[in-house]
Amino acid sequence: MPTINQLIRKGRVSKVENSKSPALNKGYNSFKKEHTNVSSPQKRGVCTRVGTMTPKKPNSALRKYARVRLTNGIEVTAYIPGIGHNLQEHSVVLIRGGRVKDLPGVRYHIVRGALDTAGVENRAQGRSKYGTKKPKAK
């Protein structure tokens, strides 16, 4: 416990909170060729690698992921949600924040139904999260 004198001399230092999705907090000015501290809710990027990885214990699956080079020059690993996807190398995708708990190092999600990413086929519920259009009434 500090004394009053110690508090007067030093004061309390507030903790710095680290971002959970740091790649979204950096921008890039291509004219000046310099990084800027402009945050954005989503970012566009190009897939450099698409593959599957296995989750941590106790889960077992083949989770789909893509390595994405963003417009600010940072390369991140992003999860591809939903069943089936049409992504391959050089696909242009939109990423948002949000980690995948059982995949270490995956801090971003790819937005389905935006840019080159198709929505999930034959999805009836939770369609807005997977970029699926409303089915035609018969």
Swiss-Prot record:
GO cellular component, one term: small ribosomal subunit
Marked site: Not modified: D102
Disordered as annotated region, ranges: 33-55
Result of changing K56R: In RPSL1; KO-267, confers streptomycin resistance but not hyperaccurate translation, increases natural antibiotic production 10-fold
Ribosomal protein listed as a keyword: yes
Pfam families from the UniProt entry: Ribosom_S12_S23 (PF00164)
Single GO BP term: response to antibiotic
Keywords tagged on the record: Antibiotic resistance, Ribonucleoprotein, Ribosomal protein, RNA-binding, rRNA-binding, tRNA-binding
GO molecular function: rRNA binding; structural constituent of ribosome; tRNA binding
Gene3D superfamilies membership: Nucleic acid-binding proteins
Subunit architecture: Part of the 30S ribosomal subunit. Contacts proteins S8 and S17. May interact with IF1 in the 30S initiation complex. Interacts with BrxC.
HAMAP family, A to Z: Ribosomal_uS12_B (MF_00403_B)
Further comment: Many streptomycin resistant B.subtilis with mutations in this protein produce increased quantities of a natural (but uncharacterized) antibiotic. A number of substitutions and deletions can promote streptomycin resistance, dependence or pseudodependence; all but one of these (K55R) are associated with hyperaccurate translation.
Functional description taken from the UniProt entry: With S4 and S5 plays an important role in translational accuracy.
Family from the record: Belongs to the universal ribosomal protein uS12 family.
UniProt-recorded name of the protein: Small ribosomal subunit protein uS12
